[in-house]
A protein has these predicted regions:
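N-terminal secretory targeting modules
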Residues: 1-89, 142
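Serine-esterase "nucleophile elbow" of acetyl-processing enzymes
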Residues: 70-140
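Structural motif
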Residues: 87-88, 147-149
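Loop/turn elements at helix/coil->beta-strand transitions in domains of secreted/extracellular proteins
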Residues: 117, 144-148
């Protein structure tokens, strides 16, 4: 178990208030949303791949049953945060977030199912370890954390 109190993490910048997610095209997300595409998993990229590989079984599966990115009110690919029940925090990049994957196929979802508890996916695609630390520092006092995975 690690202590995530303010004295234990030396970070370059502190998050004072969590801001809504701003995606790469400049749009700002507010409230819970379900997206068919996420910046690194674009419709254009899918069409190009499907045109070049029309018999690819994975692409055919995704064409019949498209991936949806269900985001909570903070822009995380996670249900709304239930702060009363203990849960597992998952930090990381697009692999943890699940770009190009059904939620149930992500490593974070599988580990959470195995260990039990609420699912707090704080993954941030395209970001680094310092972003993960800032997010952990901000959310550590707001969530009932059972385990932290990175």
């Amino acid at each position: 178990m690690i202590n995530v109190g303010k004295k234990d993490l030396c970070l370059p910048r502190e998050i004072k208030e969590y801001q809504p997610l701003q995606i790469s095209n400049g749009d700002v997300m507010t409230g819970k949303q379900t997206l068919d595409w996420y910046p690194m998993d674009s419709e254009q990229r899918f069409r190009e791949n499907f045109t070049n590989h029309p018999t690819n079984k994975s692409l055919l599966t995704y064409k019949k049953n498209p991936i949806q990115y269900k985001l909570n009110e903070y822009g995380f690919r996670s249900d709304s945060f239930d702060t009363e029940k203990p849960g597992n925090v998952f930090l990381g990049c697009s692999h943890t977030f699940g770009i190009g994957n059904y939620m149930e196929n992500t490593w974070s979802h599988k580990v959470n199912k195995k260990v039990g508890g609420k699912f707090f996916n704080l993954a941030s695609p395209g970001k680094g370890i310092m972003t993960s630390l800032r997010l952990l520092r901000y959310w550590s006092s707001k969530l009932n954390i059972k385990n932290i995975f990175h």
